[in-house]
Amino acid sequence: MVQEGRGKATAAEIVFDHVWHHYPGRAVAAIQDLSLTIPAGEICVLIGPSGGGKTTALKMVNRLIPISKGDITIDGRSVQSMDVIELRRGIGYVIQQVGLFPHMRVEDNIATTPRLLGWPDAEIRGRVRELIELVGLDPEEHARTYPSKLSGGQRQRVGLARAMAADPPLMLMDEPFGAIDPITRERLQDDFLRLHQTIRKTVIFVTHDIDEAIKMGDRIAILRPGGLLAHYDTPENILAKPADDFVARFVGADRGLKRLSLRTLREIELLDAPPETERPGLPSASEGTKVRDALSIMLTSGNPSLLVTDGEGTVRGMVTIDLITALLSTTERSAVP
């Protein structure tokens, strides 16, 4: 278990050990013999077609759905042996519909679990303010606001803050960004990834979107219909060498292009930038930009070249469409199973 600050656990290893779930009246199990280990501090994305059991698997962790056979452990402790209230208070839970209490202000929504745990009022106030800032909201503007006055993206941020309020070692996120418009969704994804670099929680994240899975996951578990594990690995390894035809079809034919979304401009060999007199009109992007996004910038601008800058805005080099095309060709060849 990873420890940080205040003596609380910040992350926990999660193990699914030959887990099954049978819904009453159904001939086929929803989850069949699922075994995987999620290292402490990583984001594991569960994905698969409809009927793959991804949400069922997630809800067995906090016992919203019972385990029919097998076990799930949190840092070696069986979830089935724990008091269910204690278990759920120690797990952050974020869902698509957010589920904020409409009659409670933002600050009171976030404070719900710390109050149940008996934290001192002063500590709760400090934690609430810290979390409101951490998720990108303004405590002065939003703390005493009711959920009905917030946008969908703001409500999702408050839901995230509430899930983190008691500093749980594990967070369960069931399609948390699925009901938000694409622009806000991308912003929330980026903000959560930056936030995760700070909080380093173990996260189990359910989505139906393979691009979101590739972006968000340290590891991805692809489930077949019937809850059978098809492939569990890093996004890079899944895209490079899918386990079988089902996985290859599921991730899509453009695996090479998807792999470009895993690399930043910082990670590729840049071309020399042209003299300053030849730079006006050239688009630019920071070296932290994904290679796939850099390609989109060039195609959108109609310019085949793009300047690459560091955090201070200094030009470090240049990429071209030809360079990325050659890189794409290389990744596609290596992605052939």
Where in this protein do the model-derived segments appear?
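Helix-to-loop junction immediately C-terminal to a conserved catalytic motif
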Residues: 62
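Hydrophobic anchor residue at the start of the ABC signature
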Residues: 160
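ABC ATPase NBD coupling module
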Residues: 78-92, 116
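Conserved ABC ATPase "signature" region
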Residues: 115, 122-141
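Conserved signature/switch motifs of ABC ATPase nucleotide-binding domains
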Residues: 148, 166
